[in-house]
Structure formats: structure tokens, C-alpha cells
């Protein structure tokens, strides 16, 4: 007899960012999901040349939540916690982003990874090293890929969600979960 499965619980979300516009779209999705699940959100940036001190260039949490109408303009970090989420920012000084992300996820496993993915075609596919898919595959973590040049289902301006279609890939091998 099959036991009843409990609803999906996501308590930790990981969002690697390169600070591009595409990553800003993925950030909005990661933040909105963290709010929905009352989860911890870890935002990570890997750079070979930037000092690990300071996080001024990271996506701005409180201004985003204020724009979404969830916090007042003059909110504090404590106000973010009252929304039921916890934010961690990680900067890795490394030349190999894939290796740094895999190392971080091995030390601090996550339930869901949300990241932008760039769809290269033709010759460009040979020149650019894929990051999103290999990390997801190697770490075997649930992943929300936010393709480049799309707005996705979360409005960056309002935080409102709009989902019309959902595609679930199903595979016999490996067994679906």
C-alpha cells in the first residue's frame, strides 16, 4: 500500500547570480518562492577578481520587498525576518564558478536551486561553458531554470505571480520522484 506523501516542503533555496538582467529575473523568482515557503534564501556570486568583503552589488532584498508592498521603505533586517524568511549572501573568490557552486552546495545542501540559464545555439554553444544544467545534474537538486530573455511567472516590479502553463518532464530512468 502506498503511503500518503506529505506536501512538498522547501526550507532552503539557493540562487547563484552573475548580476546580469537575467539573474535579476531569477532572483525575483527565488525571493518570491522563499516568501511562499517561508524558506531560507542563499544568494551566491562567484568572481575571480572581486574582494569577498561587502555585498553592495548583490540584489537588494529590502527595496525589492518594499516595491512589492510587503515592507515599508525604511525597513530593517528584522522586518525581513518577520516575513518568515532568512537571507544569506555568499561571495566566493574563485575562477571556476561551477566548482565553487558545487563545493558550496556539498557543504550546505539545498532543497531548490533557482537560476538563470542562457540558451546558446550553434557556434555560441561551443564558445560558452554551460553552468546551470551541469550543476543541477551533478548535485541532483530540484531546479527552477529561468531562461534568458523571459520575464518568467514572477513580476520583478510587483512580486505578483502569473502562471499559465507548466511543463513537468517525466522520465522512466532515473525514476521520477
Task: Go through each PLM region and give its residues.
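Gly/Ser-rich helix-loop-strand patches that form or flank binding pockets
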Residues: 1-4, 32, 102-155
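Aromatic/hydrophobic pocket-lining residues that form π-stacking "cages" and hydrophobic walls in ligand
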Residues: 30, 76, 101
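Generic structural signal for helix capping and beta-alpha/helix-loop junctions
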Residues: 50-51, 58, 97, 122, ...
Amino acid at each position: 500500500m502506498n503511503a500518503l506523501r506529505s506536501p512538498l516542503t522547501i526550507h532552503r533555496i539557493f540562487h547563484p547570480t552573475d548580476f546580469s538582467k537575467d539573474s535579476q529575473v531569477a532572483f525575483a523568482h527565488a525571493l518570491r518562492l522563499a516568501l511562499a515557503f517561508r524558506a531560507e534564501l542563499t544568494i551566491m556570486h562567484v568572481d575571480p577578481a572581486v574582494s569577498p568583503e561587502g555585498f553592495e552589488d548583490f540584489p537588494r532584498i529590502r527595496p525589492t520587498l518594499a516595491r512589492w508592498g510587503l515592507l515599508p521603505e525604511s525597513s530593517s533586517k528584522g522586518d525581513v525576518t518577520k516575513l518568515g524568511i532568512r537571507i544569506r549572501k555568499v561571495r566566493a573568490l574563485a575562477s571556476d564558478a561551477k566548482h565553487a557552486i558545487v563545493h558550496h552546495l556539498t557543504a550546505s545542501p539545498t532543497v531548490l536551486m533557482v537560476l538563470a540559464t542562457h540558451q546558446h545555439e550553434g557556434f555560441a554553444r561551443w564558445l560558452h561553458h554551460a553552468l546551470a544544467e551541469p550543476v543541477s545534474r551533478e548535485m541532483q537538486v530540484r531546479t527552477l531554470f529561468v531562461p534568458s530573455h523571459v520575464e518568467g511567472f514572477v513580476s520583478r516590479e510587483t512580486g505578483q505571480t502569473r502562471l499559465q502553463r507548466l511543463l513537468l518532464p517525466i522520465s522512466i530512468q532515473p525514476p521520477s520522484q
